[in-house]
């Protein structure tokens, strides 16, 4: 059922805006829209977005230290009251500040350690040099250079000495072997030219009053201090991470505050107002909620205008509501539509899904495995429930067709598809005819409700009669009746099919309509042969898995070792094969069943085009807000 909507305009004093919007968010009764002329948002929006981002960063950082063991069994979200959720907490904000400071400090320490280690590594080749860096400089009579010579040229060092230089050789580093070359000023050009020919690369050491070993020791101590501080900061972060639940609550609080500040409103000097939608049956409850905050407010409600499209909210029973996800993936119903397609579509989807699976064993697996998954993970998503409920349909059709994990453990109630393919095809096409007829019947109902009775009779009913008559021609007992129905319906279509056209189209339009009916419905009916195809493919693969498992199973001639290996191999092939086949069949049934609903069924009457009803409500990820009817006293 599509829930009727009312257009709401709420007027109140400017000073009451924040408490009123909090009350609307608390009750979740009104969807506020951004269509008001001159609308604006709360000035604190950017600030609240920044706060949410900060909490998110702190939560992410704390998560790296939290000692939380993830269980495959998901726990239910903690339930909190809205007022508790929105209560300010100075302590939690201080925790966020401290965590972000620790994160920044750890990042700085990490960069400092990298820099220190790079400096220490650069000094390592010079540790054996017992000269302070500030003493390495030119004099009036000599020139000195420090640098590296590639290790492969070290045997040619005498060439530098022959040119008049003195070479001090130290340890090897990444660039090469560390050397210090001293030469008399008169011979320096020749000496350094000889060094360059050996690949000498000059390095300017820092002018500090330390030897390389002394500076290296200082850097090592500095790195140890930073590492110690880092360990202390990480320990503190681990302690603070024990407050991760408080941080999660704070994140939900800030997210809810952001959503509140995103609300569009307009205002004058003294009054503010918002526009939106609410359920028609919740207007009184909305008015009571507003009066809890202030008596100086006015709630104006009215039916939607012809040029307005309200949001869509569907309300169906527990089972049918799960299949709304299938419709929504096609297009959400338009609230101005006469009918909600979900009830009829959901029943057909359930029936056809079970036929496509067509195996009682697989249906039982769907019920047990998906039911267990729902229980353990607390996942109550619509797609999960569709598979769970379709398991019962699969069991039913599996019993009808006598298929149990690809074997005929019990006689089929109707027939075995593999033994009588043509009859099974006829059943599948028959299901298709009924499915299509139900879509045409929905269109008939819409035409009657919207004041087009002749369209319902001359277009929709005539199509049903024509197809029914043509199908009767295949029965000897009903052939004569089928001829009469076919002739009458063809005549009606030809004579009335062009009634909306002008000129010659009134006479030729009927023939075109007749062709479209025969070709369109004929092609649509043949589309249901895919039910048989999926049924057979799943059954054959299941049989193959059974045969493969049976081939490796031990027999009377198997030894002890062969018996153990054969039994384990057979069981593995059986389990893995059937699980793989089940998953593949589920995917195929989901896709092809959806296709039949979208094209063959919805194509007869449904267009959609709606958008979801999303009332202002708390935006939470980690906790669940308790639903309390605060408006009621």
List the predicted regions and their residue ranges.
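Conserved, carboxylate-rich catalytic/transport cores that coordinate ions
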Residues: 1-6, 18-21, 25-32, 264, ...
């Amino acid at each position: 059922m599509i829930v009727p909507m009312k257009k709401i305009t709420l007027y109140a004093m400017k000073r009451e805006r924040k408490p009123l919007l909090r009350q609307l968010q608390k009750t979740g009764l009104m969807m506020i829209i951004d269509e008001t002329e001159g609308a604006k948002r709360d000035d604190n929006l950017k600030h609240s977005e920044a706060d949410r981002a900060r909490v998110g960063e702190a939560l992410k950082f704390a998560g790296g230290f939290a000692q939380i063991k993830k269980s495959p069994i998901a726990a239910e979200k903690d339930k909190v009251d809205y007022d508790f959720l929105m209560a300010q907490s100075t302590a939690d904000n201080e925790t966020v500040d401290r965590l972000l400071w620790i994160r920044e400090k750890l990042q700085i320490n990490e960069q400092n350690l990298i820099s220190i280690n790079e400096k220490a590594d650069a000094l390592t080749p010079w540790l054996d040099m017992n000269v302070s860096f500030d003493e390495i400089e030119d004099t009036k009579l000599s020139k000195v250079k420090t640098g590296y010579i590639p290790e492969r040229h070290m045997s040619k060092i005498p060439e530098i000495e022959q040119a008049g230089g003195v070479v001090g050789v130290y340890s090897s580093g990444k660039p090469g072997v560390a050397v210090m070359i001293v030469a008399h000023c008169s011979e320096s050009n020749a000496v350094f030219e000889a060094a360059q020919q050996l690949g000498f690369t000059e390095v300017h050491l820092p002018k500090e009053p330390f030897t390389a070993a002394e500076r290296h020791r200082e850097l090592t101590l500095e790195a140890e201090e930073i590492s110690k501080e880092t360990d202390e900061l990480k320990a503190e972060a681990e302690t603070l991470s024990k407050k991760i639940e408080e941080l999660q609550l704070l994140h939900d609080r800030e997210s809810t505050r952001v959503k509140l500040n995103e609300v569009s409103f307009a205002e004058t000097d003294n009054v503010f107002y918002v526009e939106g939608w609410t359920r028609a049956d919740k207007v009184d409850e909305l008015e009571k909620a507003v009066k809890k905050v202030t008596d100086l407010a006015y709630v104006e409600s009215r039916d939607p205008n012809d040029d307005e499209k309200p949001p869509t909210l569907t309300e169906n029973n527990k089972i049918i509501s799960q299949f709304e996800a299938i419709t929504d993936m096609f297009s959400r119903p338009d609230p101005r539509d006469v009918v909600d397609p979900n009830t009829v579509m959901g029943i057909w989807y359930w029936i056809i899904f079970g036929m496509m699976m067509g195996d009682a064993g697989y249906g039982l697996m769907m019920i047990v495995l998906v039911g267990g998954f729902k229980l353990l993970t607390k996942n109550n998503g619509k797609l999960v429930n569709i598979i769970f409920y379709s398991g019962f349909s699969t069991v039913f059709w599996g019993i009808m067709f006598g298929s149990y994990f690809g074997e005929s453990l019990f006689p089929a109630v109707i027939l075995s598809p593999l033994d009588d393919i043509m009859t099974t095809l006829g059943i599948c096409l028959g299901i298709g005819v009924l499915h299509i007829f139900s879509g045409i019947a929905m269109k008939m109902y819409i035409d009657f409700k919207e004041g087009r009775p002749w369209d319902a009779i001359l277009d929709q009913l005539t199509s049903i009669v024509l197809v029914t008559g043509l199908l009767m021609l295949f029965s000897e007992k009903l052939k004569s009746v089928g001829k009469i129905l076919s002739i009458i319906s063809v005549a009606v279509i030809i004579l009335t099919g062009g009634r909306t056209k002008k000129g010659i189209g009134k006479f030729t339009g009927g023939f075109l309509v007749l062709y479209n009916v025969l070709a369109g419905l004929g092609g649509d009916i043949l589309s249901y042969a895919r039910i048989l195809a999926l049924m057979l493919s799943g059954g054959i693969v299941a049989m193959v898995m059974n045969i493969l498992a049976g081939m490796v199973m031990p027999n009377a001639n198997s030894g002890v070792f062969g018996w153990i290996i054969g039994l384990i191999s057979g069981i593995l092939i059986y389990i893995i094969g059937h699980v793989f086949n089940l998953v593949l069949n589920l995917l195929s049934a989901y896709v092809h069943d959806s296709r039949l609903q979208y094209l063959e069924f919805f194509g007869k009457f449904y267009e959609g085009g709606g958008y979801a009803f999303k009332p202002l409500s708390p935006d939470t990820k980690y906790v669940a807000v308790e639903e309390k009817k605060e408006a009621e006293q």
